[in-house]
């Protein structure tokens, strides 16, 4: 796989993640990505961990909505919010700066991509608060 093909696949995956978050379909993310182990409790499935992440995120957005007296949501994917993908031999990394009505939120998403010898890509999602 060329670097360009890898970068295109990575960007497509980030788009899927961000759009699932914007649509509040947190559980769906588990079908194409893992959540960082820091979000997973013992015995918890990836789907359950993504749902818990969604509860946390919804709580943050609700708190800001109440404090600012305007609605806070995560916008759908915007390519301009995607930083350049740091390509390495078998592990790559990218950050995505989510927005609310085009305004950056106070956290960002970190996505790590690992490629095995068969060129299969595994994806790990995290949030930097």
Question: Which residue stretches match the model-derived regions?
Answer:
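Amphipathic alpha-helical interface segments used for dimerization/assembly
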Residues: 14-21, 33, 54-57, 61, ...
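Short, charge-rich amphipathic alpha-helical segments embedded
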Residues: 37-55
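Short, low-complexity N-terminal intrinsically disordered segments enriched in polar/charged residues
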Residues: 1-19, 23
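Short beta-strand edge/turn micro-motifs at domain boundaries
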Residues: 99-129
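Short, well-ordered alpha-helical segments enriched in acidic and aromatic residues
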Residues: 25-36
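Surface-exposed, charged secondary-structure patches
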Residues: 53-106
């Amino acid at each position: 796989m060329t670097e360009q093909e890898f970068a295109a696949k990575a960007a497509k995956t980030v788009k899927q993640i961000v759009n699932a978050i914007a649509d509040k379909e947190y559980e769906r993310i588990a079908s194409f990505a893992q959540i960082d182990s820091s979000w997973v409790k013992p015995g918890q499935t990836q789907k359950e961990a993504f749902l818990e992440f969604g509860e946390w995120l919804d709580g943050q957005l609700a708190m800001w909505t109440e404090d600012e007296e305007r609605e806070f949501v995560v916008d759908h994917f915007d390519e301009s919010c995607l930083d350049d993908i740091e390509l390495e031999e078998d592990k790559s990394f990218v950050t995505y700066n989510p927005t609310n009505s085009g305004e950056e939120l106070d956290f960002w998403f970190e996505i790590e991509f690992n490629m095995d010898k068969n060129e299969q890509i595994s994806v790990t999602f995290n949030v930097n608060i």
